Amino acid sequence: MVCPAPRQPMSPRARAMRIAMDVGRSHGFMVSDRLIWIDLEMTGLDPEENVIIEIATIVTDSDLNIIAEGPNIAIFQPEEELEKMDEWNVTHHTANGLIDAVRESDVSNATAEIRTLEFLREYCEAGQSLLCGNTIGQDRRFLRAHMPTLQEFCHYRSIDVSSVKELSSRWYPKEKGFAKPSGHRALDDIKGSIRELAHYRESIFK
């Protein structure tokens, strides 16, 4: 009689993921270990008055390893929408070239949403991957208003890197913070957010 090999103990991270999946099954939904990172650039802060002018997407695993880099899209908007930008947006989006990219783009908001969803469906199941980013609640507000199908594709839970930053500065003030450079272009901002969360994982979540 051959005895089965002893089962290896699960790591804390694997055990936590198993618990999350079991909870998901018991409630009729699943939580994937794949994370959806989205960053938007907008003409302002109000989703009822302003529009999206750039979107970028990355999928990582739960250890923040990049699995795939999605489309980085400047979205065409008419001049009447660009004219709604305040001085801050005009200054920064002129300097980083985004306004020119928007004017030259032939991609509509609807097409940008479709392309992003096509990318995500290759790597994620609908409703199973958390939406991640810096101040991601603001991005979700714009997605809900302007790209609702994409917003619904993401799990309703989020990982907000800005919240981790604020808590770490208050609870662990002696730990070195993370200086995230930002040119206010969507893809660069996403990559910076991933690096920032990786920094807190190594320095805070030990």
Name each model-derived stretch.
Residues 127-136, 140-147, 173-206:
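Acidic, Mg2+-coordinating catalytic module of metal-dependent nucleases/exonucleases
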